From Swiss-Prot:
Name of the protein in question: Basic phospholipase A2 beta-bungarotoxin A-AL4 chain
Residue ranges the record assigns to the propeptide: 11-18
One protein family per Pfam: Phospholip_A2_1
General function of this protein: Snake venom phospholipase A2 (PLA2) that inhibits neuromuscular transmission by blocking acetylcholine release from the nerve termini. PLA2 catalyzes the calcium-dependent hydrolysis of the 2-acyl groups in 3-sn-phosphoglycerides.
Primary subcellular site in the record, as a coarse category: secreted
Class of enzymatic activity (EC top level): hydrolase
UniProt lineage: Eukaryota, Metazoa, Chordata, Craniata, Vertebrata
Cellular localisation: Secreted
Gene3D superfamilies the record matches: Phospholipase A2 domain (1.20.90.10)
Residues of the active site: 66, 112
Length: 137
């Protein structure tokens, strides 16, 4: 309960060396308190490393869109999304990205922000965790 209550307040997160740590913090902020960010790895066809086929549900679509967003950041903007740090704030149940528009930092932050908010608004279906990707994807 204390964790849930603390997430309702505002939190400033300083830039970190690895974007994936920042993305993890965004996910923690938006998902239900009874879940951990680790439950969102190996979920569906796209949540986790790689991805193929058709997303199995809305949550998996969040990961599909995030993968494509990272792909666009790499190809169109020559960014490295997995290591690009950025400035952001978690406040009032939303996420604000602060870096200048068009910069790699802002592009990657927007990818992560969109995915984290999508996770928070999507149903988690336990049967889609660790699915047989060869069969269902």
């Amino acid at each position: 309960l204390a964790v849930c209550v603390s997430l309702l307040g505002a939190a400033n997160i300083p830039p970190q060396h690895l974007n994936l740590c920042q993305f993890k913090e965004m996910i923690r902020y938006t998902i239900p308190c009874e879940k951990t960010w680790l439950e969102y790895t190996h979920y569906g066809c796209y949540c986790g490393y790689g991805g193929s086929g058709t997303p199995v549900d809305a949550l998996d679509r969040c990961c599909y869109v995030h993968d494509n967003c990272y792909g666009d950041a790499e190809k169109k903007h020559k960014c490295n999304p997995k290591t690009q740090s950025y400035s952001y704030k978690l406040t009032k149940r939303t996420i604000i990205c602060y870096d200048a528009a068009g910069t790699c930092a802002r592009i990657v932050c927007d990818c992560d922000r969109t995915a984290a908010l999508c996770f928070g608004n999507s149903e988690y279906i336990g049967a889609h965790k660790n699915i047989d990707t060869a069969r269902y994807c």
